[in-house]
Regions:
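Short recognition patches in nucleic-acid-associated and regulatory proteins
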Residues: 50-51, 57-93
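Short cysteine-rich clusters marking metal-coordination/redox-active sites
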Residues: 53-56, 103-106
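Short metal-binding segments enriched for Cys and/or His
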Residues: 82-97, 104, 109-113
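C-terminal/domain-terminus segments
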Residues: 2-8, 113-134
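Short, flexible, mixed-charge glycine/proline-rich loop motifs
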Residues: 36-50, 91-97
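N-terminal alpha-helical interaction blocks
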Residues: 1-36
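Interaction interfaces in information-processing and related assembly proteins
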Residues: 1-15, 42-52, 59-64
Length: 134
């Protein structure tokens, strides 16, 4: 069971950027700039999406989840599958997840969502107040 907290959706930012591209104020080469590392992560760790690429309109986008957090140590900054995220959410107290949509055809990529996962705050709803003895 995943408990997403502090969810941030970047849909408005995405929409504004695409409006700039469609109006010709931003170049396609400026927004289709996925690195080879991101494209490989999409191939091996990505989850297929039902949304078609807004730039090339040739294939469905792939969602890649990147994890960051002090507690993750060597795993920080790596792409993870949804199954791995579920397992990590039960093992670690708190870490951030950034979901990026990627088109493997034209290299379009954009941050879609970010949220926090982990065991912090799961279970008993203990008061944050502590006595002086603690």
């Amino acid at each position: 069971m995943r408990t997403q907290r502090q969810v941030v959706d970047y849909a408005l930012q995405r929409r504004a950027l695409l409006a700039e591209v469609y109006a010709g104020r931003a170049g396609v080469m400026d927004v289709c700039d996925a690195t080879p590392y991101l494209l490989r992560a999409a191939k091996f760790h990505g989850e297929p999406s039902s949304v078609t690429c807004p730039v090339c309109r040739k294939e469905p986008l792939t969602l890649v989840s990147w994890v960051y957090g002090n507690e993750l140590k060597h795993a920080a900054g790596s792409a993870r599958t949804l199954d791995e995220l579920n397992r990590m959410a039960m093992l670690f107290e708190e870490f951030s997840v950034y979901v990026v949509e990627v088109c493997r055809t034209c290299s379009w990529n954009h941050l879609v969502q970010s949220y926090v996962l982990g065991t912090r705050g799961v279970g008993s709803r203990r008061s944050r107040r502590r006595t002086a003895a603690e």
